[in-house]
Structure formats: C-alpha cells, structure tokens
From Swiss-Prot:
Reactions catalysed according to its record: uridine(55) in tRNA = pseudouridine(55) in tRNA
Protein name (database record): tRNA pseudouridine synthase B
Species name: Caulobacter vibrioides (strain ATCC 19089 / CIP 103742 / CB 15) (Caulobacter crescentus)
Catalytic residues identified in the record: 47
Superkingdom per UniProt: Bacteria
Enzyme class of the recorded protein, top EC level: isomerase
Keyword 4Fe-4S attributed: no
PANTHER family: PSEUDOURIDYLATE SYNTHASE TRUB1, TRNA-PSEUDOURIDINE SYNTHASE
Pfam families (alphabetical): TruB_C_2, TruB_N
Gene from which this protein is expressed: truB
Length: 310
C-alpha cells in the first residue's frame, strides 16, 4: 500500500516578492507551509541579499519548472564604486579599492559593449558545480579555481539613476544564466575602477512580474484568513510561450493514460506555424484544464508530462 503524502494536493504557481536576507529554499518552505502543500520548488535561485520575483511552483506545477528556468529575466541594481569584494556584493571581503568614480556619461558610454551575446565568467560565489561541488562551497573553503567563460545574452542595459558620485543604478533584461554581479565586476574593470553590487532586485521572470507579486508577509496573513487561493496562479502560467491545443474529452482521456492522439491536418499546420524553429512542445488543454505537455511528431501528440488536475 502506497504511503499517503503529507499535506494537501495544492497545485499552481505563486509569484513571490522575496524579501531581503532570505534564501530561496527557505522561501519555498514557508510558502509550502502556508498552503500545507505536498510539494514545491522554485524556478531559479535568487540570492539571499536580493529581493524580488521568485516564482514558486506547488504540486503539479513543479512539472513545468524547467520551462520557466529558461525564461528571460529583468533586474534593477545599484553599483557602489570604489571597492571590489570576494563575493562581488557588499557582504564580501575587500579585494581592491579605487578612488576613480565614473560619471553617468562614462557609464552610459561603456554599456553598448555589454549588450548582445557576450562572454561572461560566472562569479566564484555561485551555485555552479565544479567536479560535483558547488562553486560557493569551494570559494568559502579558500580553494583557488576559475569558472569557464560562457555565452550569455543581454538584451537591454541602461542607467536609470545616479543618486551620488559613489553609486549608480541600472536596469537589465537578459537571458538565462546571466549574473548581475559579473556584469558589475566587468563594467567596473572596463571603467578603470572597482565596484560591487550594493542592491539587487529581480523585477521579472518570464511572465511573472511585480504586477502579480505578493509579499511573504501578505501571503501568511491570507493563510490565517483562509484566502490563499486568491494568490495562486494556474499551473499553465509558466507555459505562456508554448502553443496550446484544445482537445476533446476522449483525447484528454487518452493523453492522461499516456497514449498518443492523432491530429487533424489543419491542427498540424496551425501548430507548425506557432512553434519556434526546432521546437515540438505543445500543451493540451481540456477547457481550462491543462491535460498534458506533449511532443508533436508525425502528425501525433505524444504525452511527455501528464497533469493530475481537476
């Protein structure tokens, strides 16, 4: 006899506005506790010292996490000039200092070199694995290593404020795997000075933005008032970029059993026009209910992820 899972079968996404000085893992635990959810996860770590958008998946929504991990992101961050640190933020130990304070005009003139597909070396204090160990663990232990350069995409990078000579605030829109701290490190170097991240806020992950975000304190208050459903977004929220196909009740039943369904020629043509080059992923919907994520091949939809939603 299968062991009964603890908690409720809650499924959906929560757009959390993560507070300062809280790990992403702890944030997930507190959200799960508020909903009494059986399982949960997040779509991309947000540093403890950062605030902002942390999409959290509960229940069946955890099956859609990989699709949001690849989503574009947006940040607002403030650079403090004059000091390099081990962690590239204000918590690290000082590794270098400079009296150079770039003007706003100098910063803006340097930014075009950072836009587009660029080479970036991730920070040593990061969750990237090195020979099976997290880079930040090796860095804390004093192990010397350098992570390999990798390609990242930065779509937009601009100055939005300069409160004083020691600080400048920027916004950035970028693809997956881009580190704000590495951008700040490289920008400071290009400007002949030192600098680190003084403040960091993530403002968007895919379709999850500040407009739909909820603070942890607000969420926990809703828990006391039994109004948590107001904060929960549908499982398919993370699949906005994936073409959807309405299926019949009979086809929904077949997909739920893990069996393929045959598409009509017009359905194949419609989906081909909507799918990005090289992509075959389609979401099958029965009314407002997500039935399965499927792969379209040879005129059929083959279920890859089946959802147990009511």
């Amino acid at each position: 006899m299968a062991r009964r899972k603890k908690g409720d079968a809650v499924s959906g996404w929560l757009c959390l506005d993560k507070p300062y000085d809280l790990t992403s893992t702890t944030a997930v635990s507190r959200v799960r506790r508020a909903f009494n959810a059986q399982k949960g996860g997040h779509a991309g770590t947000l540093d403890p010292l950062a605030t902002g958008i942390l999409p959290i998946a509960l229940g069946e929504a955890t099956k859609t996490v990989p699709f949001l991990m690849d989503a574009d992101k947006a940040y607002r961050f403030t650079i403090a000039w004059g000091r390099d640190t081990t962690t590239l933020d204000r918590e690290g130990e000082t590794t270098g200092t400079s009296d150079v304070r770039p003007t706003r005009e100098q910063v803006e003139a340097a930014l075009p070199a950072f836009i587009g597909e660029v080479d970036q070396i991730p920070p040593n204090f990061s969750a990237i694995k090195v020979d099976g160990e997290r880079a930040y663990d090796l860095a804390r232990d004093g192990v010397e290593f350098e992570l390999p350069t990798r390609k990242v995409s930065i779509f937009d990078l601009k100055v939005v404020d300069q409160p004083d000579a020691d600080h400048v605030t920027l916004t950035m829109e970028c693809g997956k795997g881009t580190y704000v701290r590495a951008v700040v490190r490289d920008l400071a170097k290009a400007l002949g000075t030192c600098g680190h991240v003084a403040d960091l806020r993530r403002t968007r992950v895919g379709g999850f933005s500040e407009a739909s975000a909820i603070a942890l304190e607000t969420l926990e208050n809703l828990s006391y008032e039994a109004r948590l459903s107001e904060a929960l977004l549908p499982v398919e929220t993370a699949l906005d970029d994936i073409p959807a196909l309405a299926v019949t009740d009979e086809d929904a039943f077949r997909l739920a059993q893990g069996r393929a369904i045959v598409l009509l020629p017009r359905q194949v043509e419609t989906l081909k026009a909507e799918l990005p080059p090289g992509d075959r992923t389609v979401s099958a919907m029965s009314g407002d209910r997500l039935v399965a994520l499927c792969e379209m091949r040879a005129g059929k939809l083959n279920p890859v992820r089946v959802f147990q939603l009511t």
